[in-house]
């Protein structure tokens, strides 16, 4: 009986882990890039990836933040997406958008998101205001992709 009990406990533990493979996840992978504009301001892009199990990426997120020449964040646009992949193909199973402004001179006028095949996308239009008067708009669309092996870009 003393030899059977550890074996049975090991068997039960293995069964529990088999039932819940999504509860075990790797640490998030984070990539940061910067795209400088001619006036010295820039877009900072951060991609966060959370791999869950061998065939699922949950909560992959791409955030583009517009920063001025003083490195101050002005506004941001994010797309979050879930992907399924199997080594032969991949597909986006959900996509959502988040956008906002860090200053009183910029306002998010519209935002939308969608998905198609192996990509998710988000689009936002941000208005610039001077003295309360609407001066100009900028529209930005960002995409997040997952390849057949689970690599997110």
Model-assigned labels for residue ranges:
Residues 1-72:
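N-terminal prepro-regions of secreted/extracellular proteins
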Residues 50-153:
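Mature secreted bioactive peptide module from preproproteins
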């Amino acid at each position: 009986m003393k030899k059977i009990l550890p074996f049975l406990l090991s068997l039960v533990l293995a069964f529990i882990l088999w039932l819940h493979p999504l509860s075990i996840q790797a640490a998030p992978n984070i990539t940061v890039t910067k795209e400088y504009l001619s006036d010295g301001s820039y877009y900072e892009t951060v991609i966060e990836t959370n791999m869950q199990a061998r065939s699922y990426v949950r909560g992959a997120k791409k955030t583009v933040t517009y920063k001025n020449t003083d490195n101050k964040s002005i506004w941001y646009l994010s797309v979050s997406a879930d992907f399924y992949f199997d080594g032969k193909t991949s597909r986006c199973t959900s996509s959502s958008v988040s956008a906002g402004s860090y200053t009183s001179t910029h306002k998010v006028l519209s935002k939308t998101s969608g998905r198609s095949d192996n990509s998710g996308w988000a689009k936002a239009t941000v208005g610039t205001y001077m003295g309360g008067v609407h001066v100009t708009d900028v529209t930005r669309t960002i995409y997040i992709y997952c390849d057949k092996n689970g690599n997110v870009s």
